[in-house]
A protein has these predicted regions:
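Thiol-/selenol-based redox modules, centered on thioredoxin-like
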Residues: 142-193
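Short active-site neighborhood of thiol/selenol oxidoreductases, capturing the structured segment around
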Residues: 56-75, 83, 97-100
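Structural microenvironment flanking redox-active thiols in thiol-disulfide oxidoreductases
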Residues: 76-140
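Loop/turn elements at helix/coil->beta-strand transitions in domains of secreted/extracellular proteins
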Residues: 61-65, 91-96, 123-128, 158-159, ...
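Signal peptide processing junction and immediate N-terminal pro/mature segment
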Residues: 16-27
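Bacterial N-terminal signal peptides
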Residues: 6-16
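N-terminal "domain-start" segment that seeds a small globular fold
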Residues: 26-58, 78
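Positively charged n-region of N-terminal signal peptides that target proteins for export
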Residues: 1-4
Length: 193
């Protein structure tokens, strides 16, 4: 029995020496499609509405992005429904809506839980929503500061929209009165996709 065990050990040792080294598996990152380079316009991080965890906008590089300033107590608040519809319709083709609640027009709650409840439970929003921020004037967040500079259009009310192409360049600005499902907006989204 001892001779058999010794023979097995010797055979195993010889086999491990004579076996050619196996090629190491390629790293997982090499097997997955690398994301598009992050354009300057998206090189920002914002806190998420639901939990205030930071979210890097570079994860949306290579997508068509619609940036919208939102509010809970506005005549345009029902646009959440249309925003969710176009998000659902086009998300599979590389489209995302980014919602930025703002109290710049005195129509947003100061309570993040109330805003989240309205968005996620009342309107069934699935697109990314961020913590309350300023979207105009000297206090505007860095994304909106860039959008204003690039378009010459500062939000004049809630639910203003900026459409950004896959290349990270602004395609067009849309005022509040342009509803999410309006052909004026959807035709631009479809052309960008």
């Amino acid at each position: 029995m001892i001779k058999t065990a010794a023979l097995l050990l010797a055979t195993f040792a010889a086999a491990s020496v004579t076996q050619p080294a196996r090629a190491q598996a390629a790293p997982v990152a090499a097997l997955t499609k690398s994301p598009a380079a992050c354009p300057a316009l998206l090189k920002h991080s914002f806190k998420r509405l639901q939990d205030e965890a930071p979210q890097d906008l570079c994860q949306y590089a290579g997508k068509v992005v619609l940036v919208v300033n939102t509010a809970s107590y506005c005549g345009y608040t029902k646009q959440y429904e249309g925003l969710e519809k176009i998000y659902s319709k086009y998300a599979g083709r590389g489209f995302v809506v980014l919602g930025f609640p703002s109290n710049d027009f005195n129509q947003e709650s100061s309570n993040a839980k109330e805003i989240a409840d309205l968005c996620f439970n009342t309107y069934g929003v699935k697109f990314p929503m961020f913590a309350t921020t300023s979207v105009k004037g000297p206090q505007a967040n860095p994304l909106h500061t860039s959008l204003i500079k690039l378009t010459g259009q500062e939000p004049k009310w809630n639910f203003n929209k900026y459409l950004i192409g896959r290349d990270g360049k602004v395609i067009e600005y849309f005022p509040s009165k342009v509803a999410p499902e309006d052909k004026q907006l959807t035709s631009k989204i479809e052309a960008a996709l």
